[in-house]
Structures are given as C-alpha cells and as structure tokens.
Amino acid sequence: MAVARYSETAERLMTPKPGIRKPGSDVVKSPFRNYLAYARGFLTQERILRGREFIERNAAVFDEIEMTSGVSRYVITAVIGVETFYGRNMGRYRVLDSLMTLSFDYTRRAAFFKEELAHFLEFCWRQEVQPVTVLGSFAGAIGYGQFMPSSLDRWGADGDKDGRIDMVESEPDAIASVARFLTAHGWVAGRGLLYP
C-alpha cells in the first residue's frame, strides 16, 4: 500500500473531544447542541427545494423501489439529503488514506477500521475501481448515502442495472442501496414515522 498517505485530518477528527463538566458535577455534557437545534440546520428552504428536485429527477427509480421494497421515496431522500445534501458534500478525502491511517495509526478503533479497509479493497477489486481514486469522508464513508465499506459490501445495490454498484456517480444505485439498507434493518412498509 505504498500509494496510501497518512491522513492527519482523519486521525484528528476521529479523536473524541472532551465533554463539558459543570463545576461540582459528575455529569459530563456533550459539547454539541441539542438534537432539535442540530436538526433545524437540515430543514432549510434550499435543502427542501433540492430534495424535491432529487425526487423529480429520480421518479421512475423511486416508483420501482417503493413497489419492490416498500421504502418511501421521502425517507430515502431525507437520508441522502442529511448525509450529503443530495450528493453535494460526499467528502473530499481519499478513502484509502483515511482507512489506512485509522487502521494503523489510530489504535483506539484499529480493528474496526482494518475490517473496513479489507472491505474497501475487496469492493474496489470487484468493481474494478482504483482505490486511490475513491473520495469520501474523513472516516472512509462513501457516496450519496455515506456508506462505510462493509455496509456498501452488504447493502450496496445496482439501481441502474448497469452491472456495477456506484454510490458516487449513480443516483439510482444510491437510492436502491439506502432502500436495501433500511429494509435489512427492519423497515416495515406502511408503518408510521416517529420524529421528535
């Protein structure tokens, strides 16, 4: 793996941040905002507009996916919208560099990332993709749905039926993969949704 480079960013961003402790208290509070404040950042007019465009652009794919899996186009679109703003922010880090760094230089979760690295390399080999060309998150997540390589391996789907699974360039593949992931994790068609 002589082509892989150490990624200081991956190691730094994976390192847990210290919590905030009130004086005299044993309770450690997360330095992050509460969920509702966090979620409001996703409910912008632009994100809603882009979501509608994503649904319209992929209407035929969604028709088929809803019929075969029962997963709602709105739920799939919401997942992709939160994860990558409909493909706008899929990551700018070489996945190979991130996974190599987190496998061998970040001992806290090395076993997990070694498994992810193995899945990534196997996936690239099967799909005939050069590992150094794949970009993703600092932690190695890939494509519209930000799947880790093991998830891509298990639940990646060929939505455009071209014989390949491409979560970066193919919206149909991303849509089918998110639906497959949700179905595998207990999605029940017609059941209501809960939200805070």
Feature locations, PLM:
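Functionally critical loop-and-helix segments that line ligand-binding/catalytic clefts
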Residues: 146
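Cell-wall glycan-active module
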Residues: 1-114, 119-135, 140, 150-196
